[in-house]
């Protein structure tokens, strides 16, 4: 018998959650329940996930649960579900979340069928704003679908379920195949490496299609057939779509991730900009900057409820979870709901400061041309860690040239440097360099310098065992505007030798 599950309905839970009055069960999942509750001090409703540790462990879902908790703890956006606090016991984890009463976008589409373009656009604008916020804070969702998009009482989008999300690391690429196959990008189901944001763009394209058409672009009961359609980009556009929608959807559903439209480009698209609310017309404020903004009126309300003012202010500045900060954020969120939005003041400041309202983050030049070594420490998400702010520089080499032209020049440079390579994707290679070997000892096998489907590498047993062998990866992907970025990631080998190789590589390149 699961004794912890039996405690869900008795006074045991209330003793653990003295600040909440538990109500009815909203849903039952694989390893717990979701209950509606009332925050005693403020009277505001919340949803509380009660997760059973034993069930989570048996299903090997500890990492998924922990990941979602860490990510949501730091996020503050009107279209991302809010997490107020997490209370842990030896048997259960209690996650206090924002309560949304109107269910999933999936059910909304099933009930209403295809939506009018204005309504679909309103949903889509909110989704893109939330996804952009994730990406700016180095998180890729990887499982965007209507089932994970909730609706509040005013039918505003709330992005949820970050259990499959990954924190993006500069110079690193993801390979895990996850998410729902109907919404997954070709590179994901193919098991190829991907940078991250481009897979969310694909999923958003599928969602937009579903909003406007009432059906999925890629659907088949037979999974191999479904994968074939996705990998081939095989779908049809109904005739009822406007010309602008017919232009945007195919650009989001381009099979080649390098050529796929980006979030900043979606923002600039005419269909997206039509009837765009002012609070969504600018990029969202940085998470760290948000934490610095404290609403004095709300603080005073919290103090009037019996909390110490200095403790409230210190806890807010440090992003500490306690009764005072939970009370503050519940009051804040319920005071400023969309459409005014509790973030609108930050958006307004950005606009009034004279910046372009459609400004997107731009990467400045690095101190060494356009190249910076991609060996960067990982940003952790500890209890009081901060999500990194926007980058003011870019990793890798940037170019306006055509991707094939760039890769041909890259291969020429690698051959000149006597580097072996193996193609692992359309624009992705594993490389190996052993300093000091003569050309004949580190032989290349591709005499025709075209980026073809076949791999081009010869493994040398002696070279592979050399203590000075340098292993690295190259990947080209699309950056802002019409630029392409070549990322260089050291996998193994001495750091300074790798930097020497990169310097030599730069001098060999002809078009970048």
Swiss-Prot record:
Residues 399-512 are annotated as: Interaction with PAD1 and SKP1. It is an enzyme of class 2 (transferase). The keyword Ribosomal protein does not apply. Coiled coil: none annotated. GO terms for cellular component: chloroplast; cytoplasm; endoplasmic reticulum; nucleus. The lineage of its organism: Eukaryota, Viridiplantae, Streptophyta, Embryophyta, Tracheophyta. ATP binds at residues 26-34, 49. This is SNF1-related protein kinase catalytic subunit alpha KIN11. Inactivated by the begomovirus AL2 protein or the curtovirus L2 protein. Activated by phosphorylation at Thr-176 by GRIK1/SNAK2 and GRIK2/SNAK1. Inhibited by trehalose-6-phosphate. The active site is at residue 143. Subunit of a probable heterotrimeric complex consisting of an alpha catalytic (KIN10 or KIN11) subunit, and a beta (KINB) and a gamma (KING or SNF4) non-catalytic regulatory subunits. Interacts with KINB2, KINB3, SNF4 and probably with KINB1 and KING1. Interacts with SKP1/ASK1, PAD1 and the N-terminus of PRL1. Potential subunit of a SCF ubiquitin ligase complex consisting of a SNF1-related protein kinase, SKP1 and CUL1. The association of the SCF complex with the proteasome may be mediated by PAD1 and seems to be inhibited by the interaction with PRL1. Interacts with DSP4. The gene is KIN11.
